[in-house]
Amino acid sequence: MENKEEKPKIPQNDFCKIQPTIVATNRYDVYLNSLIDKPHYYFDFMEIMRSADAEDEVYIHLNNNGGYVDTAMQIINAIKDSSAKITTCVDGACHSAASLILLSGDEVKVSGHGTMLCHYYSGCASGKGNDIEKQVDFDKTYYKKFFKKIYKNFLTDDEIKNLIKGTDVWMDSKEILKRLKNIVKPKGL
């Protein structure tokens, strides 16, 4: 006798008809496992996020020592623009610019071996002396606001003040998970 799997019977009656619906969804897994480099390397990834439907899911896996903060900002904007559910995952190292991306997801998952480094931006300026001074003054104000917004409720106010003064904040997966409980934010910041 042949053992065939039977489909579950859906109860029906005159008052309630149950119609099974098949919903097609896509799941995209993106692995950011090396330096976050210049934005043009991420255009396909950002296009996937921006064109994904509300039923789709995008998982951003981070095992990364950081990189260009401007590129991280562009990725964060793509997360904000996405209709899909964005889950960011600490798969290993989540340092520097990667930590900014992590905190922008709709949901965050942390592996038992994950680590995180939060620090203030690094950068450089070039040009005529007065132009350099203007850029440095602008960067001070701009990045101070940006980092306060990203790390709000994840880091304490004192940690953010010290971070802006140059102190690094390191944490393991247990500490990351504990702090994530404090965050209530709109999608993508």
Segments from the language model and where they lie:
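N-terminal organellar transit peptides
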Residues: 1-189
